[in-house]
Amino acid sequence: TVALPFFGELTEHVEDFLAERGYRTFVCNSMGKADREREYLDLLVSHRVDGIISSAHNDGLADYSSIHLPLVSVDRDLSPIVPNVRCDNEAGGRLAAEHLLKRGARRPALLTSRTGIHNLREKGYRQVLQQAGIEPVVLTVDFNTPNSERPRLIRERLDLVVDDIDAVFATDDLAAAQVMEWAAERDLRIPDDFKVIGFDGTVAMRHAL
């Protein structure tokens, strides 16, 4: 959804780039729902669009393999035959965890949307903690969670481990901002008492923070 800062900024730049070249852009927000994503795919194919750029985050959706249109994915692999544009998420996860440790964190947690082998930012985080002999603490708030509920769920996850952690690597900047709000509510000074690092580096979040 473009409600998230990263995808909002991505959509803005893609739309501007295409407009300068004479293309109109259809923006489809799947809101993390696989059924809605399938409906949008059917709609775009039926309208014979010139191509599809997808940044959807639904695992196991096989529909993309059967689309005979120019197609590229952003950030997440959709199919072995679909080109993918993304940063080095695993290296980014390592850099984030290493930075927290260098700044004095001893028990950094990971806050992410989904845990598992496909989460390369988590993989990088785990590698660094394993090398340092630190037990990982992974907190999840599902990607599909409505924006109105995310802050509450993040606070609940953090409250459960507040005595066991002294830093958080949040795999998106909006979550990092919500961790900072949680820390302020508990009189934890950043970065003196508690350390937080995000990932996206969006313009909106840099201005907000």
PLM segments and residue spans:
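N-terminal winged-helix
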Residues: 1-16
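Structured beta->alpha junctions
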Residues: 2-3, 29, 114, 172
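Bacterial carbohydrate/catabolite-sensing allosteric modules
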Residues: 13-24, 39, 45-48, 66-73, ...
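Short catalytic-loop micro-motif centered on adjacent basic/acidic residues
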Residues: 26-28, 53-54, 109-110
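Short beta->alpha connector loops
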Residues: 31-34, 54-59, 115, 174
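Acidic, Gly/Pro-rich loop/turn segments at junctions of secondary structure
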Residues: 51-61, 76-81
